[in-house]
């Protein structure tokens, strides 16, 4: 706050505390090592979506996944789950998972700050499609982005979803990697 934003005593900043509520705060003390703020005004409205959206996607090549994580955060996604699929090109080695998740969490935090979100999306990694299914059984709606669905001229599934009231509902959207989703995975998911 002091170095990057060049904020001084009595300047106002937005702070989101653990209660996920945004406050306008006064800086009452600052130095290089710490900043002390005092809540000044509670910001009542939230810019979070009323629908809890989870996106599940296999890891992509490094620069693509980082860009995608940033944009998903800016769009208002609530959870992001990375999973191994049959066709994903980018594989994460078991000993690298924690360091990658830590780096990607930092990207999510920065994107949430930049887009003035009240929360930082959660990021998790599951090792298989079956694990993904097991961890998302409680979702209200499940959507799979499948390239061959465009052959279905009516797209009834998507039309039905978009007609529903999605407020206070949860949706998981599953996407394939650069190689797409295999026929076997589609049969498991549908």
Model-identified regions with their sequence ranges:
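Mobile, glycine- and charge-enriched loop segments
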Residues: 13, 38, 44-55, 162-170
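Residues in the short beta-alpha loop(s) of Rossmann-like NAD(P)-binding domains
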Residues: 19, 86, 148
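Active-site/ligand-binding-proximal alpha/beta "capping" segment
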Residues: 142-180, 185
């Amino acid at each position: 706050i002091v170095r990057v934003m060049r904020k001084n005593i009595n300047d106002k900043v937005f702070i989101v505390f653990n209660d996920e509520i945004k406050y306008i705060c006064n800086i009452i003390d600052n130095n290089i090592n710490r900043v002390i703020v005092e809540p000044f005004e509670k910001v009542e409205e939230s810019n979070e979506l009323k629908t809890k959206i989870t996106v599940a996607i296999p890891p992509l090549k490094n620069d693509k996944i980082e860009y995608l994580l940033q944009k998903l955060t800016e769009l208002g996604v609530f959870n992001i789950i990375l999973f191994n699929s049959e066709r994903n090109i980018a594989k994460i080695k078991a000993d690298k998972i924690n360091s990658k998740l830590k780096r990607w969490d930092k990207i999510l935090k920065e994107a949430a700050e930049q887009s003035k979100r009240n929360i930082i999306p959660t990021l998790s990694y599951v090792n298989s499609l079956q694990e993904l299914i097991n961890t998302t059984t409680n979702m209200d709606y499940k959507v799979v982005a499948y390239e061959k669905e465009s052959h279905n001229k009516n797209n009834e599934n998507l039309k039905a979803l978009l007609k529903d009231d999605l407020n206070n509902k949860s949706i998981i959207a599953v996407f394939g990697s650069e190689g797409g989703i295999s026929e076997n995975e589609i049969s498991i998911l549908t």
